[in-house]
Structures are given as C-alpha cells and as structure tokens.
C-alpha cells in the first residue's frame, strides 16, 4: 500500500515540513561522536568487535548511565501523556512478522532463531501490534495508546550497511516506541499527535529538530503515510534521522485480523488502523545529545529534565 500525499521516486524527493528550535553552530570544532564518548571513557568498540563483530558496542560509566537515563525519561514522558507502558516479548512468531511487514523488509531486517518459529524483533512495534492478532475490539476500548521499551535487533542488509566505528547504524540497540490502534476515522489525527510527541521530547532536551515528509517512492510497503524526525548535528551541520512516524492504515490489521465491533451495530465488524512512532532510540539520540550539549572545554551539559535520572548531575566532565 502506498498512498502518500507527496509523490516522488525516492528519499531525495522527501520534503521538509517544519523546523523546531534554532540549529546550534558552535565556534569550535565538534568531534566525532565516538571521540566524545571516548573522552568520558564511555565506549569500547574494540572489545565489542572481538566478542561480536562490527555493529555492536560496550557502553560504560557516565555514557551508559546517560543512555539509560534517556530511556527512563522517555518512558515517563509518554506515561505522562496518557500512554500505557509495556515491556513486550523480544521474539515473535513468523505469522506475526509477516503481518507487520513485507517479505523484503523481513529478509533485510529480521534475525531468525535457528530451528524455531521465532524471530528477534527489529522494533517493539512488531510485538505490540502482534498483541492484537485475531482480536475483536469494542469501539469503546479504542484508541489503544501504548508505549513500549525493547532492545531491537537488525541485520541492516542493504545500501547503507553497518558502521565500522560508530553507533548510528548498528545490529543491536534499545528504543522507546509509541503504538496506537484506533478507529479508521481517528488515524489521521493520531498521526499528527505521534510525531509531535517526538518533537516535544527532543525539544525538552534542547535538541533542534525538523520533520520530513516521506514521498511515495520512499514509503516502505504497507505504509499509508510516514514522516521522519531528524535532529540537528552541529558537527555535520545538517539534520540526520532519529525517528520515524508511520500510519499503516488497515494494512497490518487486515493481515493480522485486528477488527473492531461497531457500538451502534454490534454485528458490524471492520478493520482497525495502526500507527507507530519512535519516541527515542538512544544510540542516535546520544549522538544528537552529545553534539548539541557539548561545551568548548569538552564537558557536556545535562538539561534539567534528565538531571533527576542522572543522580542530580548537571554536567559530564572528561575523565
């Protein structure tokens, strides 16, 4: 399914919608994100390469604590907005995988457990939407607004591949997600609310962002509409993707049998609409956070919302 309002051949024809916050352009050189982490003795890529290969990392000390703090803050941020918090299964059956994504996406992303009908999830959206497989939901129980934490596992087969030294594109990371199951007439409004939640989250941490509408040629299979949320990189002096918001219409619901019972006519059943959006994926968020809060002396300011999760720390200083 592909019905974006914006027609185009590929991601080069995506269109910026709106910017939020003024991009920071410091008068000093911003180091590569791994170099910043290493200055705090906060990452070990060499050890991860020995144990697991490229696309993995050891985080430690204050950087590991910052990573966990961002996730904890994201959890509470979404709970405060009325979403129900979940920790879902991290492995799902093949019929759920085929219900939430196309075969091509599955081949490029999913790790299969040898000898079992189980796949490691690439995002908690997979298991959260799968939660509703073969269900009939009364109209008055909708919308279901859920926020879920999980590790995510991705093969990352394709044009971009894995970074040898970095945490932008990797095989394993953690993420806080939003998922909504709603009536068809409500999905457009929920789409707007979901991407706005991510924008508000990043702005609460003083990170400039923009939204980018994905054209028809850049839409993954099953998606009706999608936009990327991109954060500003002072080092690269450009925006980079930190999350994606998608309206799947009734595509996943049809594949998985997620139906709604009409309140006015209980004999009438129709398919729900499903949506998902990234609240935050800390590896990429760490890049944006460290670059945008870096000071010339190498220290990193910790914004007020994160300080309670960091034991009251107001800054990170070099080891």
Residue spans of the language-model regions?
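TRNA-recognition modules of translation machinery and tRNA-sensing kinases, especially anticodon-binding
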Residues: 19-319
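Short, flexible active-site-proximal loops enriched in glycine and acidic residues
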Residues: 5-6, 48
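Extended amphipathic alpha-helical scaffolds
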Residues: 6-25
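Short, small-residue-biased leader/transition segments that mark boundaries at the very start
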Residues: 1-3
């Amino acid at each position: 399914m592909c019905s974006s309002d914006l027609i185009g051949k590929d991601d080069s024809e995506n269109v910026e919608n709106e910017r939020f916050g003024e991009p920071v352009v410091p008068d000093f050189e911003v180091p590569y994100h791994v170099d910043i982490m290493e200055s705090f003795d906060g990452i070990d890529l060499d050890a991860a390469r020995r144990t697991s290969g490229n696309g993995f990392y050891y985080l430690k000390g204050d950087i590991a604590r910052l990573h966990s703090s961002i996730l904890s803050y994201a959890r509470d941020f979404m709970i405060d907005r009325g979403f129900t918090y979940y920790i879902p299964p991290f492995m799902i059956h093949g019929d759920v995988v085929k219900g939430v994504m196309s075969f091509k996406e599955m081949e490029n992303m999913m790790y299969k457990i040898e000898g079992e009908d189980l796949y490691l999830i690439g995002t908690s959206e997979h298991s959260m939407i799968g939660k509703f497989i073969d269900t009939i939901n009364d109209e008055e129980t909708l919308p279901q607004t859920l926020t879920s934490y999980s590790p995510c596992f991705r093969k990352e087969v394709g044009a971009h591949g894995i970074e040898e030294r970095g945490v932008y594109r990797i095989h394993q990371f953690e993420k806080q997600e939003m998922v909504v199951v709603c009536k068809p007439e409500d999905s457009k409004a929920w789409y707007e609310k979901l991407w706005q939640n991510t924008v508000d989250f990043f702005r609460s941490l003083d990170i400039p962002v923009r939204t980018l509408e994905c054209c028809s040629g850049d839409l993954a299979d099953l998606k009706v509409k999608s936009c990327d949320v991109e954060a500003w990189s002072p080092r690269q002096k450009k925006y980079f993707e930190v999350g994606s918001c998608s309206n799947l219409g009734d595509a996943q619901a049809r594949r998985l049998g997620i139906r709604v019972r009409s309140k006015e006519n209980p004999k009438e059943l129709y398919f729900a609409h499903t949506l998902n959006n990234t609240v935050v994926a800390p590896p990429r968020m760490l890049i944006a956070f460290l670059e945008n809060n870096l000071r010339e002396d190498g220290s990193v300011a910790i914004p007020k919302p994160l300080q309670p999760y960091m034991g009251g720390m107001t800054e990170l200083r070099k080891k």
